[in-house]
Amino acid sequence: MFLGMFSKTMEDKSNSSRNRTNNTPLPQQIRTDMGSLYSADLTAYNSACREDPDLQSFDSSLHQRTNRVINSLASGAQTRSLSFDALIEVSGCLLEMNQEVVRFIIESKEDVWDNKDLTCLVNAYFDSSIKTLDFCNAVDNCVKRARIGQMLLQFALKQFEMESSGSNKSVEPGTNKYAKTLEELNKFKASGDPFDGDFFMLLESVYEQQVMLLEILHKQKRKLDKKLKNIKYWKKISNVVFVTAFVSVLIFSVVAAAVAAPPVVTALAAALAVPIGSIGKWCNHLWKKYETAVKGQKDIVLSMRIGAYVTMKDMDNIRVHVDKLKIEMESMMQKVDFALKEKEEEVAVRLSMHEISKKFDVFTERIEEVGDNATKCSKNITLARTIVLRHILSFPSSSDSGQGNLIEAITL
């Protein structure tokens, strides 16, 4: 592109050189206002160079290139002609600058405003949270079944009190004194274990999914942390791109001046003596927008990571309390089995019922603990989903469709 523009400029100058006088006005390609036009930005660039050793190195290299070009052009300025060596110097300088920009851009890797990885990650998080909510619902159903068993045991204890006190007048002679109690115990036994094998398979599946999600979120967080540390490098890219375009314009102006108006070469050379390049307002906006985008991604990932971690801990608590409840459930079932097996022995039934009575409050407490933890887990998941959604809604996007894709991921 640079060589094409250069060739066209030289062709135009060659066609008009025969009729040109010393008073010929400068062609449009010659820019003498670059220094004043970007004076504020050049000052900002000076500050950036002082803070960034790599930018200092780039600036020094750029000065060397432009000085070589100026010297080559100045040597033939009085004859209003360009030597072959000067042409090579100009084209070589422009090519080197282009290559430098390409190198920086290649190393920049990706555009953060259209991040497909983040969209996939959000999808995975909300899919996982939905499955975890399903698990919480499964826990609630199990707790409801356990509470039914609790009610049966409670009713059995009431029957036992009545039958033990002799207040139950409906007992026929020759029948088991604790017939009603044993009937309720049979109902409790028939209700079975509310936390069967399918429940624990679901728990393990959801838990493993949470562990995998947490690992992915951890890797993504480290990746974004690295990007935030490299923000200065991204700012450097915008500096390099802008200053390259700036110098390219000035070089073409010098080339045009060398043919059209030799005295202007000196003035342009003086302009180039100013520390060249500028980040400019648009470049400054560019890298700040990038930094904001990366921080926005990090906020989303952090909120998902916290949500996944809290969910894992909630599930750990549910697992612990379910295990405790199963222990109490098995203990109750053993006592019920003993009473039913020894139903003809009133003493054995009384002993079993006394043991059931002593453990009944603990059994009830374990059921409530599981239910409370399932409710807490469900609330935490809902809260985490809301927080992630808020971050997504405030997430900077290069297009409305990008944000729409993220929102669609959690509303389907």
From Swiss-Prot:
Pfam families: DUF677 (PF05055)
UniProt keyword terms in alphabetical order: Coiled coil, Membrane, Transmembrane, Transmembrane helix
GO CC field: membrane
Main location, first listed in the record: membrane
Keyword Kinase attributed: no
Family membership noted in the UniProt record: Belongs to the UPF0496 family.
Cell compartment(s), UniProt: Membrane
Residues spanning the membrane: 240-260, 263-283
Cysteine disulfide links: none
Residue numbers spanned by region Disordered: 1-30
Species the sequence originates in: Arabidopsis thaliana
Coiled coil: 314-348
Recorded topology in the membrane: Multi-pass membrane protein
Record-given protein name: UPF0496 protein At5g66675
